[in-house]
């Protein structure tokens, strides 16, 4: 079951709030039901609300409704929204920004200034860039290692056989903290098998790095499968905020007017959306 909010066409603030509140309730119920089905405590699952392509006003409304974890996959948009919501820094539970998209090295310093968790670390060069950015910002930046579950280089992710070395690189990098793993289910493949493989890789990682406990997996269409496989973070976009209207781009797959996340040339990247049901990044 996927509950989708109506496309917001310049709705008044009160109407948009009501729409988001209803969608949030439906998604929260889905997560709770998925947790109950596999004997998990829903408070151990963080709902990341991915607000990409949506106005900062939506992010602000979600925060007012109790959402604390907000996801973005482009630095320019994420940095602008973080600045727009900077007045909430004094809130008892300020917004936590998750960077969930493919990250270029030249954007690492910017992301290191505002991100609470980077989900998409997949290569040593990015580790070095984020480390420099975190040190310059005077903060420690938690990072997840994005694992490739299908071997498609367009979608990002470190191959499974490179995970241990990349984990050691993050663990040894000043200014960074290894927090766990992230993955996106293969396009057209069974999500359950993919997420079970991710769970096995996460367990192997924890054996060497016991504090790396986070598993970011699952989006609007497969969150139940991800929760069953042990996801600690689910990245929810369209089920919370409604279908997105993307401008036509060369290489975008036919019919992909509302992908959870497509990058340049149709390469699918991470899509994330969030509210904590109790967990924290």
Where are these regions (language model features)?
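Expand to "…catalyze enediolate/carbanion chemistry for C-C bond making/breaking, isomerization
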Residues: 224-228, 236, 240-247, 265-268, ...
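Intrinsically disordered low-complexity regions specifically enriched for long asparagine
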Residues: 1-2, 281
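Conserved alpha/beta-domain cores
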Residues: 2-221, 227-229, 241-246, 252, ...
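C-terminal accessory extensions appended to soluble enzyme cores
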Residues: 255-269
